[in-house]
Every structure is written in structure tokens, then in C-alpha cells.
Regions:
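An alpha-helical support segment within catalytic cores of ATP-dependent transferases
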Residues: 129-181, 281-282
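Active-site acidic catalytic loop and adjacent metal/ATP-binding pocket
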Residues: 22-26, 162-209
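Regulatory N- and C-terminal appendages and interdomain linkers associated
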Residues: 1-9, 148-163, 264-282
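A conserved alpha-helical element in kinase catalytic cores
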Residues: 30-68, 79-94
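ATP-binding glycine-rich phosphate-binding loop
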Residues: 2-27
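Active-site activation/catalytic loop segments of kinase-like enzymes and analogous catalytic loops
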Residues: 206-235, 245-273
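A glycine-centered beta->alpha junction motif in the catalytic cores
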Residues: 67-82, 100, 128-136, 248-264
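Conserved kinase catalytic-core helix
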Residues: 78-123
Length: 282
């Protein structure tokens, strides 16, 4: 067992284990987070350690027996969920703006849009076949009515996905890419307070924002109010809407059991809320 007192020259007691690599410890005056950092995380940390970005910087770094340990101040419940959500998007936006560079035009992504259209078409055909089987079955039950009553929502996103693909393929502007934090999950953020550099990578900001949104989409908040300020009118909003709806489509299934039906209800409710909140993303 690692002797953290000896490593950091502190008199610490273990308070809680957040993960296998992350613990909370305290002395008489302060609480700390101690994290065992992987080689990838440490390498990525070195790339950004001097940047003026809202990462929580370690108080001390100690290497011991092929391990690298970071010591941080511990802040308990310093942000609400709403503020944390906005903080993630703000950080991603800053990272992109700081490291942005020009890349080929969106028209070069036509192959990707064709692939999305093909996958979406196959998925819609599969769902359509299952719905037709339910409709043709003379015996209806509770599950049948659940799927039939909500299927118009799936038809709505079918039209929207094809419409977004068509409009995106017509846009010829450049798109910015840059270094970002990948797609930090809600659990990752609250448990690690943005002290993980493992997922530092390149990407386009719209891609990161839709993944962050999907992790927070069950929250009963105004997502548009938070996300809108990070997306431009011409390209980003259309791409964001397409990828959220495409992700929802891939999550959708119709099976004769209550577990699947329950997921179907939750998913179609999320889709309805998203379509209403982001109805101006055209």
C-alpha cells in the first residue's frame, strides 16, 4: 500500500475512495485529492500545463515506483449541475479557440454524410418493419399501443435527419478543429473535477458538444440556453442537431418486452423535448 504521508510529506488520513486511482484524504486543516496518473494523462498534462485554461492544476507531483501521483486541493460541491454543464462547454470552447487551425471544407465530409444517411435508412427500415408487424398483428396488448402511440416521433426525426444532411452538404465554409478534452462524462467531471488529461485529443467542437449534451440530456433544464452560445448559425447548429438525432436513432429499438418499451418511452420523450427546445436549429 502506498504511503501518501511519506510521498507528500503530509499527515494524511484517507477519507474516501472515488475510484481505484483517485482518493480523498485530509490532514487537520485541509482536504486533498490524490490521483494516480497514467503515462498518457501525464504526457497530455505536460502539453497544457502552462496554458491559461480552466483546468485544476496539481499542488504537487510525485513520481514513485513507476507511478505518478498528483495532489490537488479538494473542493466539495463547489458547482451546481447547471454550472458544471456550462463549465464543461466553456472549457471545450476555450480549448478549441486557443488551438484552432483550418482544415478541409465540410464538402470533404460528404462521404461521412452519405454513410450516416445509409445507416439511418437501414435503421428506419428495421423500425418500420417492426411497427408494421405490430400493426398487422390482430392481437394488441399494452406494449403494442406504447410503440404505436410514440412512433410518430421517430417519423419526425427521420424527416429532420434527412433535411439536416441535405443542408449540411450544401455548406462550403471552413470548420475549425483543435485540442479538446474529448467528451467528459457527467460522472467523470464530478468525480475527477477535470483532473484527467487522458482524453485530450483533436476534434471539432460541434462533435464534443453533442456528446456532452447526450450525457446531460436527462436533466430538466433549458439546454438551448447553455449550448446556443457555443455554436455558430451556419454550420455548427445543423451538425449538432444532426448528430444528436442520429445518436437517438441508434439508441432506438422495438422489442416485445417491458424493458425495451420503458427505454422507448424515455427516449421518445427526450427526442420530443430536444425537438421542441432546438426547433430553431434549421
Amino acid at each position: 500500500m502506498t504511503d501518501y504521508n511519506k510521498l507528500f510529506n503530509l499527515h494524511l488520513e484517507i477519507f474516501d475512495n472515488l475510484t481505484l486511482q483517485t482518493i480523498i484524504a485530509h490532514d487537520k486543516e485541509n482536504y486533498y485529492v490524490i490521483k494516480d496518473i497514467s503515462k498518457i494523462e501525464y504526457t497530455n498534462y505536460l502539453k497544457v500545463k502552462n496554458d491559461k485554461l480552466p483546468f485544476l492544476k496539481p499542488l504537487k507531483i510525485v513520481k514513485h515506483e513507476n507511478h505518478t501521483y498528483f495532489l490537488y486541493n479538494y473542493y466539495e460541491n463547489h458547482q451546481s449541475i447547471y454550472e458544471a454543464y456550462d463549465g464543461i462547454l466553456k472549457t471545450i470552447s476555450l480549448l478549441h479557440k486557443k488551438t484552432a487551425k483550418k482544415v478541409p471544407q465540410p464538402k470533404m465530409a460528404e462521404i461521412k454524410y452519405k454513410k450516416i444517411a445509409l445507416i439511418a435508412n437501414d435503421r428506419f427500415n428495421m423500425l418500420e418493419m417492426k411497427i408494421r408487424n405490430i400493426e398487422l398483428n390482430p392481437v394488441k396488448n399494452d406494449l403494442s399501443w406504447i410503440y404505436l402511440s410514440k412512433y410518430h416521433i421517430i417519423l419526425d426525426i427521420k424527416l429532420e435527419i434527412y433535411k439536416m444532411i441535405k443542408r449540411l452538404k450544401m455548406i462550403k465554409d471552413d470548420v475549425e478543429v483543435g485540442i479538446n478534452h474529448g467528451f467528459p462524462s457527467q460522472v467523470h467531471f464530478f468525480n475527477n473535477s477535470f483532473i484527467s488529461y487522458k482524453y485530450l485529443k483533436e476534434g471539432v467542437i460541434e462533435n464534443d458538444l453533442y456528446k456532452v449534451f447526450l450525457d446531460f440530456d436527462s436533466l430538466e433544464i433549458n439546454h438551448l440556453e447553455i449550448i446556443d452560445k457555443y455554436l455558430d448559425e451556419k454550420y455548427s447548429k445543423k451538425y449538432f442537431k444532426l448528430m444528436v438525432l442520429f445518436s437517438y436513432l441508434l439508441m432506438c429499438d422495438i422489442e416485445p418486452n417491458y424493458t425495451c418499451a420503458s427505454k422507448y418511452i424515455k427516449l421518445t420523450n427526450k427526442i420530443s423535448r430536444f425537438m421542441y427546445q432546438f426547433k430553431n436549429y434549421k
